[in-house]
């Protein structure tokens, strides 16, 4: 443990332990609880939005309370399985190939947002087709509550002392006790919680209620992934980059262009396509 008194900035509050409570071999982690809170909040929020029929195209919400409850299980599977496989296959395949038992250790952290997005997208498409639901309206529905969960999980990243930021001298810099160098760093997890999470949630709520964005299916989903991609790109500037794949490092070494930025580019492009499609089709009723 680093010397608490040697920190030239705000010392990390060490009463924040990644484990909330442990009973023998069973432990409850903040990280896992964060995902549960995010999923349950989204489930609740979707039901609240579904009750306001005037918000929706043709006054017809794609999910009622029963279907929302059915989908939450598939959403959870998409997030967890997709997020973990994304971490394994997109970010660090070499490590997990050499340590296969670590693949299932979700409680230790290591979930890819982009993998979780792919997993959730697959779940949405499958569920929408099975229940004859407009896929774009379904995307909008799930996107509306997603940022809140992202914000909660980013706070859990802070508690876990992972994905910290670069060295800085800003007044709110934090010295993380798990940092071997024990240097003042940007609390980039909290930046992400704000930008990718809670502020984005407010922006989506604003366009839903003020501009009736649900009446143009695809608008909310498009705004979500554009905004997330931009926020993630900005946060990468302040964050210590994760170890990029070797092929990517060889191409962009020293450029400042990170793998996280590269993964966000197609999201932004697809988001613009979704919004263009929504307005081109002149939905609204």
UniProtKB/Swiss-Prot annotation:
It is found in: Cell inner membrane. This is Phosphatidylglycerol--prolipoprotein diacylglyceryl transferase. Its EC number is 2.5.1.145. It comes from the Bacteria. GO terms for molecular function: phosphatidylglycerol-prolipoprotein diacylglyceryl transferase activity. Catalyzes the transfer of the diacylglyceryl group from phosphatidylglycerol to the sulfhydryl group of the N-terminal cysteine of a prolipoprotein, the first step in the formation of mature lipoproteins. It is a multi-pass membrane protein. Pathway: Protein modification; lipoprotein biosynthesis (diacylglyceryl transfer). Its main location: membrane. One of its GO terms (biological process) is lipoprotein biosynthetic process. One of its GO terms (cellular component) is plasma membrane. It comes from Bartonella bacilliformis (strain ATCC 35685 / KC583 / Herrer 020/F12,63). It holds the Pfam family LGT. Belongs to the Lgt family. Keywords: Cell inner membrane, Cell membrane, Membrane, Transferase, Transmembrane, Transmembrane helix. A 1,2-diacyl-sn-glycero-3-phospho-(1'-sn-glycerol) binds at residue 154. Disulfide bonds: none annotated. The chain crosses the membrane at residues 26-46, 71-91, 107-127, 133-153, 194-214, 218-238, 256-276. The keyword Transferase applies. The keyword Cell inner membrane applies.
């Amino acid at each position: 443990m680093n010397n608490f008194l040697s920190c030239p900035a705000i010392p990390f509050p060490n009463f924040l332990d990644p484990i909330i409570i442990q009973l023998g071999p069973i432990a409850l982690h903040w990280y896992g609880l964060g995902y549960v809170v995010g999923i349950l909040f989204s489930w609740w929020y979707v039901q609240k939005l579904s009750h306001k029929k005037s918000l929706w195209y043709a006054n017809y919400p794609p999910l009622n309370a029963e279907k929302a409850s059915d989908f939450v299980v598939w959403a959870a599977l998409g997030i967890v399985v997709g997020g973990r496989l994304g971490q394994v296959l997109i970010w660090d395949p070499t490590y997990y190939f050499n340590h296969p038992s670590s693949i299932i250790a979700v409680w230790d952290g290591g979930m890819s947002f982009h993998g979780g997005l792919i997993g959730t997208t697959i779940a949405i498409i499958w569920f929408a087709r099975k229940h004859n639901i407009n896929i774009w309206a379904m995307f909008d529905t799930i996107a509306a509550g997603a940022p809140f969960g992202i914000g909660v999980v980013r706070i859990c990243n802070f508690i876990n002392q992972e994905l910290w930021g670069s060295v800085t001298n800003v007044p709110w810099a934090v010295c993380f006790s798990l940092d071997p160098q024990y240097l003042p760093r940007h609390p980039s997890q909290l930046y992400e919680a704000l930008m990718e999470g809670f502020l984005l949630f407010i922006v989506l709520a604003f366009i839903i209620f003020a501009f009736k964005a649900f009446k143009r299916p695809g608008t909310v989903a498009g705004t979500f992934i554009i905004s997330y991609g931009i926020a993630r790109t900005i946060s990468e500037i302040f964050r210590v980059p994760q170890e990029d794949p070797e092929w990517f490092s060889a191409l962009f070494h020293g450029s400042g262009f990170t793998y996280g930025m590269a993964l966000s580019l197609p999201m932004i492009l697809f988001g613009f396509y979704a919004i263009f499609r929504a307005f081109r089709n002149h939905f609204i009723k």
